[in-house]
Regions:
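N-terminal lobe/hinge region of extracytoplasmic solute-binding protein
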Residues: 37-90, 121, 190
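Append "and occasionally in soluble cytosolic enzymes with long acidic Gly/Pro-rich linkers
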Residues: 285-382, 533
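Ligand/substrate-recognition segments at binding pockets and active sites
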Residues: 349-421
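Ligand-site clamp/hinge motif
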Residues: 183, 210-256, 393-395
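Surface-exposed binding/hinge segments that line
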Residues: 98, 132-175
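Aromatic- and charge-enriched surface segment that lines or borders ligand/interaction sites
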Residues: 84-128, 151, 283-285
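Detector for C-terminal structural segments
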Residues: 28-29, 297-326, 375-384, 405-534
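Gly/Pro-rich hinge or "lid" segments in bacterial periplasmic/extracellular proteins
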Residues: 67-72, 166-218, 222, 336, ...
Length: 534
């Protein structure tokens, strides 16, 4: 057994503890059940409230679903509850979907066009207060136009509309109005998916295979997900042999790399980590400070030391996976000397304690992170260390998720993004467009810097409304070029999501580009319905 070197002082102790545990022992069930540990809270299973927006919900199906097998590049979409891929009119403003026949929800009721209509209308209904409403602002109306046909009418051309059809469909009978967050679907979901939730506690959810699933009953018959929010605790329970798999940050995952009976799985993602630069904070709002901080961070060192090589440096929210829409020149080099010069030229001069000062105010601000997220903690501390080397004092503070968004106007936050990365529009729009800087628009994490850049707004809007692939790609390259000239965040890294699994004879795993979410709904288990064994 070989221990991975302690690449970060912040993670030294948990690595050593996990590395010295015993090899994996055989699971008692040895059959068709899996037990996984997740760091995300259980519940909130209503698609109208945003659950499974990227198509990962095992209790629901969308009209389309992701097709795996590509660990780089945008995955293809294929019909799910749609009988065939949606068909647009000439300007991509009207999309017609023929739905699949003979499908039933797990409560026994038949699936039909009325369920599709009810789900999407609920998102648009102000009474639902759906967090998805803003991201569906292109949807003008949805109606059934026949016994097996649904028509979506859009306010403007939107060529990536099929990505919006990954959302799970709920029965119309369950969508009776009122706040989405108060719907019974949050704790008792009813869908057409390959699994059915049979019990739910705060610390455990149990799913059983839907034996009447329209695409064939899954061979994994029972899935238990236990909620373990602490990274180190998940690693310890994984090492004890009580779990079949868990999501773990890279340094902890790597401690299992040379252990008998375990495998470390890394999936490419468009999930970024970065530091917000609040427009209402006089230090982080300064354009010179924003540029200097972007030049001062050693992203390569973060990838190697904190991600253990499982990731890539990020200067903008756009990863290389977008091909022609990616602008390779839009990067911030690591240049501490230039960063210091920019600050000096802008009037930020070193004070007696080494912290720069301008007009009597010190170059000091706070970066928040979620207390139980060791990866965000380590990145926050590395960012603070790099900033200190150019005379900027960054205080690092653990802040509970429940109050985190409310403090983002005054304090910076170590955030992640890439919730729906299957088109550049959904990767970028809510992060950079100024419409999300307005109070009450989107979630508290959308455009969390309150960033406003008219050039970027125009390019994002032009790309969103274009049906020409080459023109869209050019617009997105223009977004990146404009962004590095006037950054609104300090983007740090794109993650490879890391997981640990116990050896087994199950086959069928398929790599896929993952979104920001990386609980056990993704990883090796995203396509659990397809797993087979000899």
């Amino acid at each position: 057994m070989k221990l991975v070197p302690a690449l970060s002082l912040f993670s030294l102790v948990p690595i050593a503890l996990v590395g010295c545990t015993a090899p994996a022992s055989p699971r008692a069930d040895g059959g068709t059940a899996l037990v996984l540990a997740d760091g995300y809270e259980l519940g909130n299973y209503n698609p109208v409230a945003g659950f499974g927006e990227a198509g990962e919900a095992k209790v629901y199906d969308g009209l389309v679903r992701l097709s795996g097998g590509r660990d780089s590049g945008i995955p293809a979409l294929e019909p799910a509850l749609a009988a065939e891929m949606p068909v647009p009119d000439a300007d991509a403003k009207v999309w017609t979907v023929r739905i699949r026949d003979g499908v039933r929800f797990t409560d026994g009721t038949p699936f039909g066009p009325e369920d599709v209509v009810a789900t999407y209308r609920a998102i648009l209904d102000p009474a639902s207060a759906s967090p998805l409403a803003t991201s569906y602002d292109m949807l003008e109306s949805v109606q059934a136009t026949g016994p097996d046909t649904v028509e979506f009418r859009l306010a403007y051309p939107y060529s990536p509309w099929p990505t919006k059809l990954l959302l799970g469909i709920a029965p119309s009978e369950q969508l009776t109005g009122g706040l989405a967050e108060q719907s019974p679907l949050n704790s008792a979901p009813v869908g057409t998916g390959p699994y059915e939730l049979v019990s739910l506690r705060a610390d455990q959810a149990v799913y059983e295979a839907n034996e009447d699933y329209w695409d064939g009953a899954p061979q994994v018959k029972r899935l238990t997900v236990v909620y373990v929010p602490d990274d180190n605790a998940r690693a310890q329970r994984m090492a004890s042999g009580e779990l079949d798999g868990a999501n773990l940050p890279p340094l902890l995952a790597n401690t299992f790399a040379d252990r008998d009976g375990y495998e470390v799985v890394a999936n490419t993602s468009a999930d970024w980590r970065g530091v917000t630069l609040p427009a209402d904070n006089p230090v982080t709002a300064d354009p010179a400070m924003r540029t200097a901080l972007n030049l001062a961070v050693d992203r390569g060192a973060m990838v190697e030391s904190i991600l253990a090589g499982h990731g890539r440096a990020a200067s903008t929210p756009v990863p290389e996976v977008y091909g022609d829409a990616y602008e390779p020149s839009a990067v911030f080099p690591f240049d501490r000397v230039r960063a210091e010069q920019i600050l000096s030229d802008a009037g930020w001069v070193p004070g007696p304690d080494g912290v720069r000062v301008r007009d009597g105010a010190g170059a000091e601000f706070t970066v928040m992170y979620f207390p139980q997220d060791t990866l965000r903690r380590d990145l926050s501390q590395a960012f603070a260390s790099d900033a200190s080397k150019i005379g900027v004092r960054v205080n690092v503070e653990a802040v509970d998720r429940s109050v985190f968004p409310d403090q983002l106007t005054a304090k910076a936050g170590l955030l992640g993004g890439g919730d729906l990365p299957y088109d550049p529009d959904t990767q970028l729009y809510s992060t950079l467009h100024s419409s999300y800087a307005r109070p009450g628009v989107g979630s508290g994490y959308d455009n969390a810097s309150n960033y406003v850049n008219s050039r970027i707004d125009r390019a994002l809007d032009d790309a969103r409304r274009s049906v020409d692939a080459a023109a869209r790609a050019a617009d997105y390259r223009a977004v990146q070029t404009a962004y590095v000239a006037d950054p609104g965040y300090v983007m740090l890294v794109f993650l490879d999501h890391t997981y640990v699994v116990r050896d087994s004879d199950w086959t069928g795993r398929a790599p896929i580009l993952e979104p920001h979410s990386h609980g056990v709904g993704w990883g090796p288990w995203w396509n659990l319905r397809e797993w087979t064994r000899p």
